[in-house]
Amino acid sequence: MTLALAAGTFTASAGHAELRTGPAVATDSAVYVERSSSAASRRLEPASRLARGDRVVTIVTWVRAAGTGGFVITNPVPTALAYQQSAEDMQEVSVDGGRSWGRIGALRIGNRLATPDDVTHVRWRIPPQSAARGRGQITYSGIVR
């Protein structure tokens, strides 16, 4: 099954960043699909079409134009994507639409532990020392449902 998700459409869904503090920060997202030509060879290609089971990598680039201190970036995970992991250890996830936050392995849905498939939002706290650099990237991966 092929999902008709052009990179621009998918990027727009994944690229909405919510800033919880006052600094002027701009974000942009790019979506790539991971391709394997052998067990040891993997490469990223811009995502123009995605199919169920494709592993995608979303790169969120942020640029700080003004302000001091740290800030928070929140991204909704598209419903067509099952969250897998973030390349940064400073992420928190939500499994309830952004109402509560924590780490996989600590969050619960009813009587069970939440899994990466349950993630609805990803949030990164950018500390003051990283924010002072003025720009950065955050990467997370997922599987197309």
Features from the language model and the residues they span:
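Bacterial N-terminal signal peptides
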Residues: M1-T9
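Exported/extracytosolic protein signature
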Residues: F10-R145
